[in-house]
Regions:
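Structural beta-strand/beta-sheet cores of well-ordered domains, especially the beta-sheet scaffolds
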Residues: 5, 11, 26, 78, ...
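A short, structured loop/turn motif at beta-sheet edges
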Residues: 70-73, 128, 181, 211-213
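Ser/Thr-centric signal marking residues that sit
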Residues: 13, 150, 223
């Protein structure tokens, strides 16, 4: 049975700087698109700089945020309502050829140790849902979820060797494994509705395209070892986190920075 959920989301990010900025440019991948599995009812960005919208190479709705000289705070609030229905398979007739996601990317490279581990475990290329979930289960066991053990630049191989990481690391390891087994895979950034959770954060999972000619993608949440469902809101996709992180950029000046993030996700009455 299809379950439809309407989620109200508010995501506030603040950077505070010890001294005035000379200049800063940020790329924001904070605008979800309507498509298979989700419908955006309304969405807005409230930021401290000037926004320049564009569509990036991976088909994401993105914005460049330009900050003027003299600012000591960078503020970005994304908010809106998205209706989800838990559709795990997403047709994508347009966009890049799925086979571009067979190429390794800096944060999702399958090294020799990972390759040997997958071979010893007898894991097959994830050509269907059952095989994809078996691989996700193995990755979740090899890279146990533990906050604070990795950072934004941790690679799949490093997380695999360390045996711990967060959703980002588990997604990178899964993506690297799929590519190594010959199946196009990409990283997904978004939100996960977890009622009752005291510490919400943005989430990451993966999508695979078992048959590139069909151009259908299957969403797999490695952290929760399951298909994506109505709890997931998809923001952006790319080869890895570096290509589609919610906020990334460069700055000149500012000195030390302090980052604070607030995230609220509430299910609205039907």
């Amino acid at each position: 049975m299809v379950r439809i959920v309407k989620l109200k989301i508010r995501h506030l990010t603040r950077y505070r700087y010890a001294s005035p900025l000379r200049a800063a440019v940020q790329t924001l991948c904070l605008t979800p698109s309507s498509g298979a599995g989700q419908q955006v009812h309304h969405w807005c960005l409230d930021v401290s700089g000037r926004l320049q919208p564009h569509t990036d190479a991976w088909g994401n709705r993105s914005h460049l945020m330009h900050i003027e000289a003299g600012e000591r705070e960078l503020r970005c609030e994304a908010s809106g309502v998205v209706e989800t229905c838990g559709q795990a398979w997403s047709p994508e007739p347009a966009g890049p050829d799925p086979r571009v996601y067979l190429a390794p990317s800096p944060l999702a490279v399958l090294d020799a140790a990972m390759r040997h581990d997958l071979r010893d475990a007898g894991l097959e290329a994830p050509r269907d849902e059952d095989l994809a979930l078996a691989l996700a289960r193995h990755v979740a066991e090899r890279v146990r979820y533990r906050a604070g053990t990795t950072h934004a630049g941790t690679t799949a191989a490093q997380a695999w060797q360390g045996g711990e990481g967060v959703c980002q690391d588990q997604a990178h390891a899964f993506v690297a494994a799929c590519r190594g087994l010959g199946v196009p895979a990409r990283y997904v950034s978004g939100y996960f509705h977890a009622p009752g959770s005291e510490s919400l954060a943005s989430h990451a999972w993966a999508e695979i395209c078992p048959d590139p000619a069909a151009r259908r993608w299957l969403g797999i949440d490695i952290t929760h070892v399951g298909r994506v469902d109505e709890r997931h809101v998809r923001l952006a996709v790319g080869p890895d986190y570096a290509a589609c992180s919610p906020i990334r950029g460069v700055r000149s000046g500012g000195g030390r920075e302090r980052l604070t993030v607030e995230l609220e996700i509430v299910a609205l009455p039907a």
